[in-house]
Amino acid sequence: MYKENKNKLEILLKKVANEWDLKICSINIQTNQNPTVVKIIIKKTNGDDISLEDCALFNAPASEEIENSNLLNCSYVLEISSQGVSDELTSDRDFKTFKGFPVNVQLNQKNSKKKFLNGLLYEKSNDYLAINIKGKIKKIPFDEVLKISLCTLKD
């Protein structure tokens, strides 16, 4: 599929998604598959979770738009799915949801020789992140934090 057609298809599908209060995160067209696979990753514009029903409901109008556009001149399989959970914690909701979970904190090393700290997510405030490292609470100022990701802890 030509890049121009993919871009046109993306524009059309974004309009359909907007009508359903959805946002398209990505469209991947796998022309090396037989039949061609069109994968669309969606999320809700209000930040709520995507359900299986949301994906199913979006499938029909998305498929209709693809058919009416005549941009795909071959048989295809349409897959609609959610963005899924990212390992990186960014929103306040993430920090509330994953309180007590193991995290890896990447540090900027401005004030520390360590690159990473691992522990259990304890608390997030406006100024700092607190993690539990082997029973001791460590407060890390946010200006020292580059990234916070979920991880698995080893003894």
Curated annotation (Swiss-Prot):
Signal sequence extent: none
Pfam families in alphabetical order: RimP_N
GO cellular component labels: cytosol
A biological process term (GO) from this entry: translation
Subcellular location: Cytoplasm
Keyword tags: Cytoplasm, Ribosome biogenesis
NCBIfam families per the UniProt record, alphabetical: PRK14646.1
Record-stated family: Belongs to the RimP family.
Function field: Required for maturation of 30S ribosomal subunits.
Classification via HAMAP family: RimP
Protein name per its UniProtKB record: Ribosome maturation factor RimP
Source organism (scientific name): Prochlorococcus marinus (strain MIT 9215)
